[in-house]
A protein has these predicted regions:
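Bimodal "functional hotspot" detector
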Residues: 2-193
């Protein structure tokens, strides 16, 4: 009986962590301009059969659902997933952030960036400056931690990026969602998985 109560308590906590302060936001999908586009089977997504740009393999980091569900400090907060992206009009940094907003297509992983609006990404002297809109920034400490980890770990996989400086509406802030300091550029070494 105690095990069942513990499991129900953990599930309730998980729902509270994930569901608190989340407002569903519909994100408009830009039209894809191609000749004879074909939707992927089982989806509404249209894929350009001959994308412009160079295909690059990148390592993205997504939230570990085991960590979210159990809260076990021994579990890694984010896990790597390799993905091919097309770099053309947008930089590799911008494409990484766009990919982080998409579902990882893996039951063990999830993303916490689906509601975050990225305004710009610029890189200078080994620092990626990620500018996000303040209007969609809400969540508890777990959500904020996972958003920061996903972005910092994914961008610092690139050879020329050592740290990430977060900006909110173009300005430095103390925190992203009220819990973790983002006043200085964050390095991968600043965190422990």
């Amino acid at each position: 009986m105690k095990k069942i109560s513990l499991i129900l308590l953990m599930m309730a906590m998980m729902v509270a962590f994930i569901g608190c302060n989340r407002t569903p936001v519909e994100t408009p999908v830009p039209p894809v301009q191609t000749e004879n586009p074909q939707p992927l089977e089982g989806t509404d997504t249209v894929v350009d059969p001959a994308p412009d740009g160079e295909i690059t393999r990148v390592t993205l980091y997504f939230a570990n659902n085991e960590y979210i569900v159990t809260g076990d400090a021994r579990a890694e907060k984010v896990l790597p997933l390799e993905r091919d992206i097309t770099v053309g009009e947008k930089s590799v940094e911008e494409m990484i952030l766009l990919e982080l907003q998409n579902s990882p297509q893996d039951d063990d992983l999830s993303t916490n960036l689906e509601n975050i609006k990225v305004l710009s990404v610029d890189t200078a002297e080994g620092v990626a400056y990620v500018n996000v809109a303040g209007e969609r920034l809400s969540g508890g400490s777990l959500e904020e931690t996972l958003v920061i980890y996903q972005i910092v770990y994914s961008l610092t996989e690139l050879d020329d990026i050592e740290a990430v400086q977060f900006l909110v509406d173009g300005s430095k802030r103390e925190t992203l969602m009220g819990h973790m300091s983002i006043e200085e550029p964050l390095k991968r070494e600043d965190f422990s998985l």
